[in-house]
């Protein structure tokens, strides 16, 4: 068997193994499946612990809390305090795993992977690289500053990212809950419509582009990206074997030039 065939075989095995890990991670993150038929959410002790990926707290099956939602809940409370626990958790995960979380453990990342497998014309995002900096603005503004600074009369701020932007919330929370709970269904308004539109846009873009939400919008991915340079799990280039052919950069669907910035 020549080298090319060996590489293709290894690539297929890794792809299957990765898909299995993603499916298992999504199941563990949303283990309380019967709640989908009850119209309520799990509120046990597990919700005191954050999960590493983007997964809505309000998902009926969610086994833990979303770190982004939990962080906003703390900084947006009437008694503002910096969330050391959640920040420490994110730093720990970032140092240990980096964006391995995005590629293998995040349910919303897995959904985008599945959507991109739908047959049809696929578009490259290589010329849209500047958009990747948008997720850092989302992290700073929608997750940190706005919930802390824009407050109501009693000093409480809205979880701006979760409330106005996050498509995972409407997919995992609003849609399944309203489907079986008439009270929730009757309370849906313009905000639900707005977020549903965002979800539809993300779904369509995910079919055309590879992981657009991860590349351009996700604040959790932005945080983990900041930890990449110190992460224990990362990519190293063997400079003695690298011939600078550029094949790795062409093959990378996340538009990373591994020879220049393997852990960007």
Residue ranges, per PLM feature:
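Non-ligating segments of multi-cofactor redox enzymes
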Residues: 1-263
């Amino acid at each position: 068997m020549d080298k090319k065939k060996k590489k293709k075989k290894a690539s297929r095995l890794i792809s299957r193994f990765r898909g299995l890990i993603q499916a298992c991670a999504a199941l563990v993150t949303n283990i309380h499946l019967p709640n989908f038929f009850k119209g309520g959410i799990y509120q046990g002790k597990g919700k005191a612990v954050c999960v590493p990926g983007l997964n809505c707290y309000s998902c009926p099956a969610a086994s833990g809390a979303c770190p982004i939602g939990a962080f906003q809940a703390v900084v947006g409370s009437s008694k503002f305090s910096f969330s050391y626990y959640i920040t420490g958790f994110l730093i720990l995960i970032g140092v240990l795993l980096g964006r391995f979380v995005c590629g293998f453990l995040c349910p919303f990342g897995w959904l985008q992977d599945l959507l991109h497998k739908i047959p049809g014309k696929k578009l490259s995002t290589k010329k849209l690289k500047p958009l990747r900096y948008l997720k850092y603005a989302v992290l700073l503004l929608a997750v940190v500053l706005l919930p802390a600074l824009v407050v109501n009369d009693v000093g409480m701020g809205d979880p701006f990212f979760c409330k106005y932007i996050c498509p995972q919330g409407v997919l995992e929370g609003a849609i399944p809950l309203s489907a079986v709970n008439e009270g929730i269904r009757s309370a849906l308004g313009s905000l639900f419509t707005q977020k549903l539109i965002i979800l539809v846009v993300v779904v369509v873009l995910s079919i055309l582009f590879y992981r657009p939400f991860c590349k351009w919008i996700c604040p959790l991915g932005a945080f983990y990206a900041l930890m990449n340079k110190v992460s224990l799990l990362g990519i190293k280039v063997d400079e003695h074997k690298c011939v600078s052919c550029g094949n790795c950069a062409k093959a990378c669907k996340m538009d990373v030039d591994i020879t220049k910035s393997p852990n960007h």
